[in-house]
């Protein structure tokens, strides 16, 4: 039986849309380098952890770009599915992707069944755990997922890993979006205000914790986290290698003194086999040789371990550039 991952954060996150400005500042111009090369990282919404991850990686790459000639930029996108498709099209070099979305893309399953296998998808390293988190209006008195029947529920924006995972959970329950009276498609930076304004009763969100997009509604209107458990969840976790049970700590968010049980994936950093070995090697080196700095750039990264990042949650083969660095450092 798989173990339950514990998220080990002991403090709350006071962060909002200002995160975008913070990471823009981190990407300030540096001296031009000869034979400069550009790499782009697909992330997610500007208030989410994926954007923070991309910003942290680019910050460390750009720090030494006068030496290696690579300039890194972050793209705010619709999320995991969009990132995979755009990497496949050659329009992005790298991206942050849920491990389940990466698995389906590489194997041509799930939402990628019609498109077929993306056999050039390559893993770079994994990041933080992402529990699927159900957040509801306090007044709605929702105690379990079953209580959401007939409610107004945000299922995630199209192209996001959250949306793909929501649809998989519903299918496993023998349900579809008609289970809700309204299935809204708001972005993560919109769902908190919609909840507090009474426009929706809850939302589903796969995210690293603590998250500003959950901190805001739990602070502003006492929003409640709801555990996501039961036989269907147990079967999903046992069936799919990219899932694990996850516990969100008691008191991580205001007005939520209880531990919240759920399941989830890992965020992973991916690329294409078409991206040069030297480029990926340089990006990996920038992160792993400034690892303590990287961990400080967002609370979700605080308990990352190098040894876990080279093996856990990787849904596609390692890119040769990443593999070369990891072998040099004895991590493989």
Indicate where each model-derived feature is located.
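Bacterial N-terminal signal peptides that target proteins for export
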Residues: 2-20, 28
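Sec/Tat signal peptide C-region and signal peptidase I cleavage site
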Residues: 28-34
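N-terminal (or domain-start) structured segment
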Residues: 35-104
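Bilobed "Venus flytrap"/periplasmic-binding protein-like clamshell domains
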Residues: 38-64, 70, 126, 130-197, ...
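Pocket-lining segment of extracytoplasmic ligand-binding domains
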Residues: 99-101, 110-111, 140, 176-270, ...
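A structural signal for short loop-to-beta-strand junctions that line the ligand-binding cleft
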Residues: 113-127, 132, 252-261
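Ligand-binding clefts/hinges and TM-proximal coupling segments of bilobed small-molecule sensing domains
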Residues: 151-168, 242-304, 308-311
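An extracytoplasmic/periplasmic, membrane-proximal ligand-sensing/linker region
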Residues: 190, 197, 207-225, 235-238, ...
């Amino acid at each position: 039986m798989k173990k339950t991952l514990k998220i080990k954060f002991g403090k709350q996150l006071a962060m909002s849309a200002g995160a975008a400005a913070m990471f823009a500042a981190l990407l300030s111009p540096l001296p031009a380098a000869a034979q400069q090369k550009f790499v782009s990282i697909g992330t997610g919404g500007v208030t989410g952890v994926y954007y923070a991850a991309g910003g942290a990686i680019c910050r460390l790459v750009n720090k030494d770009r006068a030496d290696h000639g690579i300039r890194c930029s972050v793209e705010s996108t619709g999320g995991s599915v969009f990132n995979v498709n755009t990497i496949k099209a050659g329009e992005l070099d790298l991206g942050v992707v849920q491990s389940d979305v990466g698995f389906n893309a590489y194997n041509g399953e799930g939402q990628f069944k019609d498109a077929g296998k993306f056999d050039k998808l390559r893993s770079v390293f994994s990041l933080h755990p992402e529990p699927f988190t159900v957040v509801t209006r306090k007044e709605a008195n929702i105690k379990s997922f079953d209580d959401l029947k007939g409610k107004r529920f945000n299922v995630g924006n199209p192209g996001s890993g959250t949306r793909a995972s929501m649809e998989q959970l519903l299918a496993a329950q023998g349900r579809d979006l008609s289970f809700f009276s309204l299935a809204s498609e708001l972005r993560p930076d919109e769902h908190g205000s919609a909840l507090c304004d009474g426009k929706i009763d809850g939302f589903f969100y796969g995210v690293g914790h603590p998250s500003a997009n959950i901190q805001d509604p739990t602070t502003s209107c006492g929003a409640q986290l709801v555990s996501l458990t039961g036989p269907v969840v147990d079967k999903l976790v046992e069936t799919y290698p990219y899932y694990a049970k996850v516990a969100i700590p008691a008191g991580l968010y205001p007005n939520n003194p209880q531990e919240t049980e759920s399941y989830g994936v890992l965020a992973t950093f991916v690329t294409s086999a078409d991206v040069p070995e030297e480029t990926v090697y340089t990006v990996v080196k920038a992160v792993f040789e400034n690892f303590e700095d990287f961990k400080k750039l967002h609370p979700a990264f605080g308990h990352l371990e190098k040894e876990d990042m080279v093996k856990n949650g990787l849904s596609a083969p390692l890119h040769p550039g990443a593999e070369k660095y990891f072998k040099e450092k004895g991590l493989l």
